[in-house]
Amino acid sequence: GPTSSIYRNDRNNKFVDINAEFPGVDYGIGRWNDYDNDGDLDVIISGNESSGRVITQLFRNDNGYFNFVDIGFTNLKLSDIAWGDYDNDGDLDFAITGETQGGKFESKLYKNENDGLFSQTFPDFIPVRSGSVDWGDMDHDGDIDLLLTGESAVGPVSKVYRNDRNDVFTDIQAEVIGL
């Protein structure tokens, strides 16, 4: 069945499984982050468990032990996740794309409220699955913009969304060919 593991580099050209109790997923993704700004890396996992249940779960790193944090994110498979501080408030927010248990495509943005909680913001991103999301300051204005690719209801798409601040993103209609 599907697995999710972390291997620690023991500095002797060997990697050792730390035996963290993460749910195994396929058709998904795992990403490092430091959402709580405590200097250690936390983990988010999204995908299909062996039972077929779709999950998106965040795990806080507490001195090398990973504890599930029940935030209530939308559960997605065929997903991608990109962390970035889109609102320039000093903490990591994230964009996520994928497909729900019911087959609905999603593209969501979660704002880190700096208190261990996240709120969903509602920019008009095209819903996709089986794609990629990434942040970068393409217009050099000091805030990060979003690149989003994947399979939409109308076929493959690639979009660039300019961050206009205050949770507003504008599709710049870039000449990007769908993948």
Predicted region positions:
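Hydrophobic beta-strand segments that make up the repeating blades of beta-propeller
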Residues: 1, 43-48, 94-99, 146-151
